[in-house]
Amino acid sequence: MQDPSTGPLATQATSSFTEHLQRSRPELLPFNQLLPAGTVPSSPHATTIVALTYAGGVLMAGDRRATMGNIIASRHIEKVFPADEYSVLGIAGTAGLAIDITRLFQVELEHYEKIEGTLLSLVGKANRLGAMIRGNLPMAMQGMAVIPLFAGFDQVAGVGRLFSYDVTGGRYEELEHHSVGSGSVFARGALKKLWKPNLSEEDAISVAVEALYDAADDDSATGGPDPVRQLWPVVYTVNRSGNRRVPERDLAAVAGAIVESRAVAGREA
């Protein structure tokens, strides 16, 4: 009887689920496709994501709008997801591809934990995400790019850390805050003015929501808080206890306070 440790499955064993798919079923990878020559198909695009560090952790928030050209494709899309217990991922770019890559990344981290019996380090997670984005480069060159933000709590260093990426999969650590997507230039301007070291978690949530509010005010592809439809940004915090999605009732209160403060000040927006 053949020893299972020396069989064909064992020889292909790897702690990377993406690598396993690349070897055995490459057609299942979301970024292993080439479009036929011609016009890039119109598809929904996710827009603005913001992230910032605060005392004891890191926070990520995303608006709820997806656009397809000049059309609002969705007002309910979610762009920030838990990658695992101690990290979160935000997506901008081609929505369908971005969501598939997010799901694959979640499985990648879970697979590694099951095979190795331990969590991958935060930098290791960031590097694996970069490799996935690099794998999508052929699609990006055809107009279907995916640009993520990745954040998590480094259990060794005891701090929240934030990583940005370029379209080639290049990984860059951001020490304070960052934003990606069509409204990022406006959100980043707000973050520069509102962020300060050692923010409390409550203040960090307020800063993130206000940055998205400013982005939505000047970028038509970014959706701001919508009290009529009761739609609020998706906000996750990550600290020593793990990740947590901020309840919508808390976000409604934060957004209401921002609007009220601007009304009292007599501001146009």
Curated annotation (Swiss-Prot):
Pathway: Protein degradation; proteasomal Pup-dependent pathway. The keyword Hydrolase applies. Residues 1-46 form a propeptide. CDD domains: proteasome_protease_HslV (cd01906). It catalyses: Cleavage of peptide bonds with very broad specificity. It is found in: Cytoplasm. Pfam families: Proteasome (PF00227). The keyword Protease applies. SUPFAM superfamilies: N-terminal nucleophile aminohydrolases (Ntn hydrolases). Keywords: Autocatalytic cleavage, Cytoplasm, Hydrolase, Protease, Proteasome, Threonine protease, Zymogen. Gene3D superfamilies: Glutamine Phosphoribosylpyrophosphate, subunit 1, domain 1. Its EC number is 3.4.25.1. GO terms for biological process: modification-dependent protein catabolic process; proteasomal protein catabolic process. Coiled coil: none annotated. The active site is at T47. GO terms for cellular component: cytoplasm; proteasome core complex, beta-subunit complex. One of its GO terms (molecular function) is threonine-type endopeptidase activity. The formation of the proteasomal ATPase ARC-20S proteasome complex, likely via the docking of the C-termini of ARC into the intersubunit pockets in the alpha-rings, may trigger opening of the gate for substrate entry. Interconversion between the open-gate and close-gate conformations leads to a dynamic regulation of the 20S proteasome proteolysis activity. The 20S proteasome core is composed of 14 alpha and 14 beta subunits that assemble into four stacked heptameric rings, resulting in a barrel-shaped structure. The two inner rings, each composed of seven catalytic beta subunits, are sandwiched by two outer rings, each composed of seven alpha subunits. The catalytic chamber with the active sites is on the inside of the barrel. Has a gated structure, the ends of the cylinder being occluded by the N-termini of the alpha-subunits. Is capped by the proteasome-associated ATPase, ARC. Belongs to the peptidase T1B family. Component of the proteasome core, a large protease complex with broad specificity involved in protein degradation. This is Proteasome subunit beta. It comes from Paenarthrobacter aurescens (strain TC1). The gene is prcB.
